[in-house]
């Protein structure tokens, strides 16, 4: 029989433990708050979907679909997949529930775990945490700029400032076919392995996304989409850049950037942080004008992004910064006696109702042991009371910073705590 102590989290799947987990929550909430301030409504998506949704939406030639998805047959012998990204699921929900029949654009935001089977490394896990937004139904370069600005504002609201925005355009339907032929002509002259040649036949852009050093060297002189844009695609891209300039969002035009998903068109972008080494991406996204129609819906445009919560937290730490409060509680209550347990439990409930974070010492610990718990809790105030103190109508209130303790009337404890914490 397996010992319980031998169980560990699956490889590449992190646990988020207090008090450090408070930083994780602060990063996630900070990125979401930037989207909500811009009018994006929350959507909660299934953890798993029909496998065909991702195969069709993300692209069968991508590493995500061909190598990284967690796919299995359920008890009804249906092929389902743990979601590797958010956009396809959002588009499915928009189509299924007719959200595109109302006011456009449909503006949605979400957060949660996503799953990809890749080699685990710092901040890059098999269960990754993301915050995403999608704006669906309007083909307007001003909307592209807003989406990018929301991500930029989210990072900056956390105090992150050492990141860079790379941006390019992947063109539209009027110029991509010609560029595809030009790129394939270049690639088929190279000495490609069988799998890479297959990718070049299905979607040659995937070859430019190959991270292997020898492939980067071989494709260094490959033609880039930015040099072959149609007039309409170029005007769209130039207008996006003009809006970003007006919004004071700095960017670097990176004509060789290729995202890892097949549905991107026109505006495409990535946020990178050099403090993270070779795996420098902390988020990215782009426009996906053909995806909704490809999934069986109306032919409406869309743009969105996914930001890595784990990666953003690592970037903050690389800058020597923290996110949010790390202290678990404000007040630690230490009851010494049976009656004191009841009375301090009531006071703890009253303080929590007033918005104060309160923990209580349980288990009949000694005063010395309970005060060690108060130290470890990070609380700034300890409330100490025995049955005799309560008979006198008082509670000891101790400053954990100075060690000073004063007696406070029971009925005045809540007001005094709020005053000290303000």
Swiss-Prot record:
Protein family per UniProt: Belongs to the class-II aminoacyl-tRNA synthetase family.
Gene3D superfamilies: Anticodon-binding domain, Bira Bifunctional Protein, Domain 2
Catalytic reaction list: tRNA(His) + L-histidine + ATP = L-histidyl-tRNA(His) + AMP + diphosphate + H(+)
Domain of life: Bacteria
EC class name: ligase
Any one Gene Ontology BP term: histidyl-tRNA aminoacylation
The name this protein goes by in its record: Histidine--tRNA ligase
The keyword Protein biosynthesis appears for this protein: yes
Entry keyword set: Aminoacyl-tRNA synthetase, ATP-binding, Cytoplasm, Ligase, Nucleotide-binding, Protein biosynthesis
Compartments where found: Cytoplasm
Record GO terms (molecular function): ATP binding; histidine-tRNA ligase activity
CDD domains, per database record: HisRS-like_core, HisRS_anticodon
Quaternary assembly: Homodimer.
Enzyme Commission designation: 6.1.1.21
A single cellular component GO annotation: cytoplasm
């Amino acid at each position: 029989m397996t010992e319980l102590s031998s169980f560990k989290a699956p490889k590449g799947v992190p646990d988020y433990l207090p008090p450090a987990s408070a930083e994780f929550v602060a990063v996630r909430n900070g990125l979401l708050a930037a989207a909500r301030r811009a009018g994006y409504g929350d959507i909660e998506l299934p953890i798993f979907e029909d496998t065909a949704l991702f195969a069709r939406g993300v692209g069968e030639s991508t590493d995500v679909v061909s190598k990284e998805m967690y796919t299995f047959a359920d008890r009804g012998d249906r092929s389902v997949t743990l979601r590797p990204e958010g956009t396809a699921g959002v588009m499915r929900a928009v189509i299924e529930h007719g959200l595109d029949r109302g006011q456009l654009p449909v503006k949605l935001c979400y957060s949660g775990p996503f799953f990809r089977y890749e080699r685990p490394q710092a901040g890059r896990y098999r269960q990754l945490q993301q915050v995403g937004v999608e704006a669906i139904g309007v083909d307007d370069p001003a909307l592209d700029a807003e989406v990018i600005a929301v991500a930029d504002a989210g990072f900056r609201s956390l105090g992150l400032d050492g990141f860079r925005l790379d941006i390019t355009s992947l063109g539209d339907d009027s110029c991509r076919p010609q560029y595809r032929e030009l790129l394939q002509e270049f690639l088929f002259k190279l000495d490609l392995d069988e799998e890479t040649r297959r990718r070049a036949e299905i979607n040659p852009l995937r070859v430019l996304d190959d991270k292997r050093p020898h492939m980067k060297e071989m494709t260094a002189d490959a033609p880039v989409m930015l040099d072959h844009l149609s007039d309409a695609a170029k005007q769209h891209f130039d207008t996006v850049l003009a809006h970003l300039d007006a919004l004071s969002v700095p960017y670097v035009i990176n004509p060789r950037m290729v995202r890892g998903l097949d549905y991107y068109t026109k505006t495409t972008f990535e946020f990178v942080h050099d403090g993270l080494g070779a795996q420098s991406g902390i988020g990215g996204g782009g426009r996906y004008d053909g995806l909704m129609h490809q999934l069986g819906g109306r032919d409406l445009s869309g743009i969105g992004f996914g930001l890595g919560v784990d990666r953003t937290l690592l970037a903050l730490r690389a800058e020597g910064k923290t996110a949010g409060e790390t202290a678990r509680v404000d007040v630690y209550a230490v009851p010494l006696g049976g009656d004191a347990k009841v009375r301090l439990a009531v006071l703890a409930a009253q303080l929590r109702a007033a918005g104060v974070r309160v923990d209580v010492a349980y288990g009949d610990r000694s005063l010395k042991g309970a005060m060690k718990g108060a130290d470890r809790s990070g609380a700034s105030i300890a409330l100490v009371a025995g049955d005799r103190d309560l008979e006198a109508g008082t509670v000891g209130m101790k400053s954990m910073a100075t060690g000073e303790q004063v007696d406070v009337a029971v009925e005045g404890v809540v007001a005094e705590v709020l005053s000290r914490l303000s």
